[in-house]
């Protein structure tokens, strides 16, 4: 065991040991901040390139799907390439995508660049966080590691649009965030190149048995699902031949994914990974989190823009409020598990309760003269509950699945939470809002368009309240038990590498 402060083995000796993990934490933060087209720049991109809102959303969803797909490959990369090689490649690839996406108006090309950027930013983030995991928790405790990890991951989800919109407001150009992130990523590459050296803790494993085609098929399957719900309102759902063709492709792609999973030796997701008894209920809970989290994307945006007439800068403060909620939720998970020593599964009930508070409060707050400050508490509570769910469900997933299937399980959870469920709920809310508006107008109510919109939004928030309260009652009546009485510990990288070597038959 190393004596003294934690040390990153790949750093050169002149870098202070106490500073080394903080540098990697900064790298992870920069990777997570990066992307292709940034959500905070949506309106500017739409205006400059004359794109539809659905086009820009689809580009962003390509990036989100790209983030979900590398998990089954991550350890194979870690045990073949050095830390220095992985960070250099990830930083340069994401920087290149950020640069190139500024100079094309082709939506398909922007989608591809966004997907590649998402894929490699996850690779860079994993390499940083896996390197400093013993600094974060010397006891290899997942109930410490995941809350701290999600402080950065979820924090960046809300901090990125906040930073983006402020930069665009100051410089009046949506490309400023791409320039900033390109510069930051090139700085990461320069620091890695100058201050690190190649270090291996074991002999490299051959870079084989990677199901690239399976990764592409599962990605296409997710994106076809997202396309249907993103463009559904625009093309009038199944009345359009484009939507009919998309449904047909979705069915065919799903068939090929399943057939390939059962008929090759090393599939992208192994069939055994789907057979755990509690996996399906767990994925349903991930879907519920996405359902509750999708309400701000349609209803809150329609309310703040269509009823209150707030601009982007005014509503941007809500991103900061949600950032504080996410950090508070992750730290509360640490407090619950490590100070109060309570079962992590009981936190799920608290998470449901705080998430349900959001639509309940919004239902009663909807008013044409509402101040922006009135939205702080419901947004904080929603983000707080969302963070609790993400932390504890990931711990539960890790407890449910052995380590060889855990990263496949993260991709399976990503199939639910990284885009598809969010797109489906947003599409259904958009359809519901249009349907409510048409119904209210046909009833001849003595209201103008703004009041009819407000009434429609309140009705949909009411439906969301009923669903959320029903789920909360289920959690109050059903005591979710941990998978085992004592939590598993993180395995050491040497142990994981030897297991992979033995499994693939590389050992002599």
Predicted region positions:
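Transmembrane-helix exit segments and adjacent C-terminal regions of multi-pass membrane proteins
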Residues: 2-4, 9, 13, 446-508
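Extracytoplasmic
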Residues: 2-7, 15-74, 124-125, 129, ...
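12-transmembrane solute porter fold
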Residues: 18-34, 39-40, 97, 268-436, ...
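Interfacial helix-cap and linker-helix signal at transmembrane-aqueous boundaries
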Residues: 45-47, 77-79, 110, 162-172, ...
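Short hydrophobic/small-residue motifs within alpha-helical transmembrane segments
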Residues: 63-65, 154-155, 323-324, 419-420
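Helix-loop-helix hairpins in multi-pass membrane proteins, especially solute transporters
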Residues: 74-213
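Hydrophobic transmembrane-helix bundles of small-molecule transporters
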Residues: 169-284
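A membrane-interface helix-boundary motif in multi-pass transporters
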Residues: 169-182, 231-241, 343, 430-468
